[in-house]
């Protein structure tokens, strides 16, 4: 059969292309975590090579697809298996391509304990693993999205002001009695205002050493993010857990700038991450828009703070 990818009766413009390949390839795979071990995941994959030969009509997409099935059907997803996959991409496109790329997107489920009670529940985190093989060598990147709660410091201050004003109004004509104040604090009339809070998303991408080994630090990275922010979204809760969550929100008032600084401070000293890019998104409940902050590790030649 004729090789239409290399020869075609239809004239074409002679030029190179940055990437050619496929997206939305759905394959089952196995991913190993440094703390939780290996588990199956359902992935959506992108796979590309560049077209460096300006005279070539196109690439051999079926070869990429078959190598994906072969690699992740027989091997767990690791830095080593990704690098071998990309080298196979280039070997089967010799004379056509000099760079290869693959990205695996999947939901990573973790069982999370409640804050106070014995309850626990499953929580799902969007995760991406990217591999790029080019003239400069191999790059392995890990990305996660972590939901958390953020309470507005300005709104909290305004709420306190309203409560103070109401307290003065209700008690200005009488001698303050401790029991009366305690009772007043437990009423809706007393605590007549609460600060607005919202579900927020931290998007974090880290550059790993390509010799990271067979397991990825997915759980470790998520734990670092949640530990820095202090207010991760919960799963199953009892009233005691909800009360503790309210306390944590009150103790960790955050603008998006505050959240970004916390994460940068937490990730900077971790040498396992050669570089990082992070974006925090506060899905405002007061406004119809989101509040966003972006920061990088500021490594020379590293990630740019591009939204």
Curated annotation (Swiss-Prot):
GO biological process: tetrahydrofolate biosynthetic process
Keywords, ordered alphabetically: Hydrolase
Pathway per the UniProt entry: Cofactor biosynthesis; 7,8-dihydroneopterin triphosphate biosynthesis; 7,8-dihydroneopterin triphosphate from GTP: step 1/1
Pfam families in the record: GCHY-1 (PF02649)
Domain of life: Bacteria
Site (May be catalytically important): residue numbering on this chain: 152
Catalytic activities: GTP + H2O = 7,8-dihydroneopterin 3'-triphosphate + formate + H(+)
EC number: 3.5.4.16
GO MF term list: GTP cyclohydrolase I activity
Family: Belongs to the GTP cyclohydrolase IV family.
Functional summary from the UniProt entry: Converts GTP to 7,8-dihydroneopterin triphosphate.
Protein name: GTP cyclohydrolase FolE2
Organism field: Alcanivorax borkumensis (strain ATCC 700651 / DSM 11573 / NCIMB 13689 / SK2)
Species classification: Bacteria, Pseudomonadati, Pseudomonadota, Gammaproteobacteria, Oceanospirillales
Gene: folE2
């Amino acid at each position: 059969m004729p090789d239409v990818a290399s020869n075609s009766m239809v004239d074409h413009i002679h030029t190179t292309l940055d990437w050619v390949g496929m997206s939305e390839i759905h394959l089952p795979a196995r991913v190993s975590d440094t703390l939780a071990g290996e588990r199956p995941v359902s992935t959506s994959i992108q796979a590309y090579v560049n077209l460096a030969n300006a005279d070539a009509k196109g690439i051999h997409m079926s070869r990429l697809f078959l190598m994906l099935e072969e690699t992740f059907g027989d091997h767990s997803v690791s830095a080593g298996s990704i690098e071998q996959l990309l080298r196979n991409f280039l070997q089967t496109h010799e004379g056509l391509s000099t760079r290869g790329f693959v990205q695996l997107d999947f939901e990573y489920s973790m069982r999370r304990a409640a804050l106070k009670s014995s309850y626990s529940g499953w929580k799902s985190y969007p995760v991406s693993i990217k591999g790029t093989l080019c003239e400069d060598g191999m790059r392995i990147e890990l990305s996660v999205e972590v939901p958390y709660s953020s309470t507005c410091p300005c709104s909290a201050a305004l709420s306190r002001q309203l409560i103070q004003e109401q307290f003065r109004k209700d008690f200005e004509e009488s001698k303050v009695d401790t029991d009366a104040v305690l009772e007043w604090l437990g009423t809706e009339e007393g605590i007549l205002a609460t600060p607005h809070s919202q579900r927020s998303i931290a998007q974090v991408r880290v550059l790993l050493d390509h010799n990271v080994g067979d397991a990825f630090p997915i759980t470790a990275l998520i734990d670092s993010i949640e530990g820095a922010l202090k207010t991760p979204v919960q799963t199953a809760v009892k009233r005691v857990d909800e009360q503790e969550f309210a306390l944590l929100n009150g103790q960790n008032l955050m603008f998006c700038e505050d959240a970004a600084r916390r994460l940068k401070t937490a990730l900077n000293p971790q040498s396992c991450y050669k570089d990082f890019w992070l974006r925090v998104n506060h899905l405002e409940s007061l406004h119809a828009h989101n509040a966003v902050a972006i920061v990088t590790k500021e490594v020379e030649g590293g990630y740019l703070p591009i939204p």
